[in-house]
Amino acid sequence: MIKAIIGKIIGTRNDRWIKQYKKKVLAINALEPTYEKMSDVELQNAFEELKKRVRSVEKDLQEKTLLEVLPESFAITREASKRILKMRHFDVQLIGGMVLNDGKIAEMKTGEGKTLVATLAVALNAMKGESVYVVTVNDYLAHRDSKEMEPLYQFLGYSVGTITASVRDDDERLEIYSKDIVYGTNNEFGFDYLRDNMKYSLEHKVQKSHAFAIVDEVDSILIDEARTPLIISGPVDRRMENYNKADEVAKSMQVEVDFTIDEKNRAILITEEGIKKAENLFGVDNLYKIENAALSHHLDQALKANYLFFIDKDYIVANNEVVIVDEFTGRLSEGRRFSEGLHQALEAKEGVSIKEESQTLADITFQNYFRMFSKLSGMTGTAQTEATEFLEIYNLEVVSIPTNLAIKRKDLNDLIYKSEKEKFDAVILKIKELHDKGQPVLVGTASIEKSETLHALLKKERIPHTVLNAKQHTKEAEIIKDAGLKGAVTIATNMAGRGVDIKLTDEVKELGGLYIIGTERHESRRIDNQLRGRSGRQGDPGVSQFYLSLEDNLLRIFGSDRIKGVMEKLGLKDGEHIESKLVTRAVENAQKKVENLHFESRKHLLEYDDVANEQRKSVYKFRDELLDINYDISAKIAENREYALNQIFSKLKAFDHQNLSEEELLGLKNILKEDFNASVELEDLEKASPIEKFVAEKLKSDYENKMKALDSEQRSRIERIVYLQILDNAWREHLYTMDNLKTGINLRGYNQKDPLVEYKKESYNLFLELIGDIKIEAIQTFSKIQFENEQDSSDAERYLDNFSEEREHESVTYRHEEALDEDLNVAVKAFSKTPKRNEPCPCGSGKKYKDCCAKSGPKKGLFAK
């Protein structure tokens, strides 16, 4: 309240920003007459001079130079747009362009021309000579926007490319990313980054830099999708019958008897009775014994699948598959799967074929991907409600841009009914009234299920209408475009065709414009504002109103008891409603509660991902060093050899051979043979002094003799490729271990420990272990490299060629599947008796190798404690 009063007196922070930008608008407008007089060639030459000026300065001074040339750049871009696109940027669009250039979020209402606004900042920032990425929510918008704006960019001397899911050829993607301006979806940009860090050549990496990105519908991408990481994964063996058995057990359990449901936190708590029933049905004496951990996990997921996730709301079943419905956009999330076995639990619930669980091979969140950019900005019609999150997570400030024409839409108070049936009856009556007079109406629903309920009611009343939900997503743009026609009735879920304008005829404007009916408040005010924003574009008339009931999820779970109390006191009859600002405010307060819960959830996830992200950056940086032909890989191998030998000798009783027992010398001899393929005589070890120097020189000479047939280029390539494979495999194993750590870390809270602190500690120790494992495995592998003919370098070339072919084939596989089905094949012939970290330990303990002898050493011999 106090903040609002101060804002009215001295102006808000947003007002002050707009005031500053308006001064620059005057400078840009003053240049317009000059550029209007120029010929096309003169205009293009003037723009080229600006490019030269920006590129002539040091990189750290380029941002400052961009600000200096901004008025000329914007004025030329506007003039070029007038000539090429027949569209002139309004003053408010110039302000939007400046906001984007400053690395902020421009909040611009629907129909204000965000696509055209972006051209100002894109054309300016592309002067630096690094690709500018324009990020959209789907392939349709990426293709549409790039094709519409390409003639303007070409006039200014820029090349334009579009990355979509249909571009599958590596060379074609590489060519597109070489363009000055690249349009694409957030998914494509993110997956390409992950793929780049699985490539075995710097030349094959498509994303050369992360200089500047403009994210369209920034709230959808950076807020709504922030909880969903991008993952490239491979299959993991699991017993498929466990999913079906867990589903049977879950279906036999009773709510409030065997388990309780916490709707607010979307969790299920099993009671003592439920545990006993599950143990009886599974045939185990203790569900929570370590050997039954998989069963208890499957049961947890089966209960969630059966009692927290609902068909036509959270997912649909199509073509014998469970397909996720995005809760914020209402779109189908094709190719995306719930993690931790939940998707398999849903498949068991619906009786469709169960697909294997997967192991993460590479992953990143949108939060950490977009935070890599030197400069990031965004556009949307709805950002202010999430301004705090944008600032805290992305360091992005939100600037609300004034509309070019005043908004004429009327936003009416909510109408609240006692039951859902009464609410829908009232909605149908209103639709009939509007349809009879010819005023178009767009009805927003929160789920596919509700949209189809409304569809059935309208069909019963014989009111012609069109339904837009995830099941009809292919016609999205066409359906939304026609929603403003006279007499049109359109039912839409949250997807509501973002990025597609609903244009009105003069006749429809006379009838009052597009009428928006919301049949339920979403958990986020922003989604409601997006629905409202479909009406009243560019000064058009329009109306919006929400119809609610006490049975709506938001009011039932989070709503204030005050609303229920008011309705009970009023003694409303069937079909009657209440309408008041007090009630509307109470509903918005409920939404704020949920928004805060989601924000804390996203922030919490980011805190965990930040730990992995620092490790990811270190690994990817080292990976790039290995890909660099100038990197001294031989020095790295020598360093690893020293480290590995230090690990061996640190376990010996003494460094002087005179104090080593015969058993220890024999153990050392065996280790050198088995792990490093080095044959030494026992008597040579007995004579050697100091022994560590003798062993180090032996390993080095064996390796040098093996590699001497190769020229320096061949040797460097083989060493880099083998090291990369070791690094990649170890990183994948590390991600698997980190996934397992994250899954169980919250249990530390029961021991009065902060799970996040514990996660940071353990993940750091795991990372140190990873680095050590890589060094030891690298020197072991290099020691075992064997060529069929060590005097013939062509043998090494064949290995390199075969490796390149395997990698090329594999890259196509994971581009289609977003998964790798097999481990990489080593590019050289190697042999090893050392098991992989996740294989059973050869000592017979039944544990994984990494949890047994990899840590403690063999039970007998050299590494005995």
From Swiss-Prot:
InterPro entries documented for this protein: Helicase_ATP-bd (IPR014001), Helicase_C-like (IPR001650), P-loop_NTPase (IPR027417), SEC_C_motif (IPR004027), SecA (IPR000185), SecA_CS (IPR020937), SecA_DEAD (IPR011115), SecA_motor_DEAD (IPR014018)
Bilayer topology term: Peripheral membrane protein
Record Pfam families: P-loop_SecA, SEC-C, SecA_DEAD, SecA_PP_bind, SecA_SW
Binding site for ATP: 93, 111-115, 501
Manner of cofactor binding, per the entry note: May bind 1 zinc ion per subunit.
Catalytic reactions of this protein: ATP + H2O + cellular proteinSide 1 = ADP + phosphate + cellular proteinSide 2
Family annotation (CDD domains): DEXDc_SecA, SF2_C_secA
One GO biological process term: protein transport by the Sec complex
Enzyme Commission number(s) of this protein: 7.4.2.8
Localisation per UniProt entry: Cell inner membrane; Cytoplasm
Binding of Zn(2+), residues: 841, 843, 852-853
GO cellular component, one term: cell envelope Sec protein transport complex
Keyword annotations: ATP-binding, Cell inner membrane, Cell membrane, Cytoplasm, Membrane, Metal-binding, Nucleotide-binding, Protein transport, Translocase, Translocation, Transport, Zinc
MF annotations from Gene Ontology: ATP binding; metal ion binding; protein-exporting ATPase activity
Obligatory cofactor(s): Zn(2+)
Assembly, per entry: Monomer and homodimer. Part of the essential Sec protein translocation apparatus which comprises SecA, SecYEG and auxiliary proteins SecDF-YajC and YidC.
Matches recorded under PANTHER family: CHLOROPLAST PROTEIN-TRANSPORTING ATPASE, SECA INNER MEMBRANE COMPONENT OF SEC PROTEIN SECRETION SYSTEM
Functional description taken from the UniProt entry: Part of the Sec protein translocase complex. Interacts with the SecYEG preprotein conducting channel. Has a central role in coupling the hydrolysis of ATP to the transfer of proteins into and across the cell membrane, serving as an ATP-driven molecular motor driving the stepwise translocation of polypeptide chains across the membrane.
Stated family: Belongs to the SecA family.
Name of the protein in its database record: Protein translocase subunit SecA
Species in which this protein is naturally found: Helicobacter pylori (strain J99 / ATCC 700824) (Campylobacter pylori J99)
Gene: secA
